[in-house]
């Protein structure tokens, strides 16, 4: 890895009077090795719709080529082929969820996320037997977040998901997460 330039990121937000929001995002990033270089890029659009003062829907769509560091659920950004050339991962992802603030201390989110990698390119062919790289992946989750007092947040989340690798192997993710955070 011989990258010297940072990622160039652009974002445009539009907020509505009722608390809803639309967002457009893009980035370009250098990918460079001693033998090859390429530009990674991505575009995304998302929104938040305020259903009630305490409930909102959120959705995002992204298309990325060559860099997955800005999103969860992604594969490696690229792989190096036999000729030492960069072969980029390319994928689409969506996520959606609904969040409700029950009172000043407790909120909950029900969400869903999906990622589908392009499976007819060199990245997929090279990673055909790699069990760490996903052709498709989805997850659903429900959580509860409790703020006993500011700045402490305690949370619990149930996650279920399924994945498929480029060679057709499948797996499941079925877990409970617990967290505690302190906002400085």
Model-derived regions, located:
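Detector for outer-membrane/organellar transmembrane beta-barrel domains
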Residues: 3-5, 11-134, 138
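Short, surface-exposed beta-strand/loop micro-motifs that present aromatic residues
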Residues: 10-11, 143
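A short, acidic, flexible beta-alpha connecting loop/helix-capping segment that sits on the rim
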Residues: 29-32, 158-164
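Conserved active-site loop/cleft motifs that coordinate metal ions or position small ligands
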Residues: 108-111, 143-159
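A generic structural signal for well-ordered alpha-helical surface patches
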Residues: 139-142, 178
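Outer-membrane beta-barrel "beta-signal"
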Residues: 146-148, 152, 171-184
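Short proline/glycine-enriched turn/loop segments at secondary-structure junctions
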Residues: 165-169
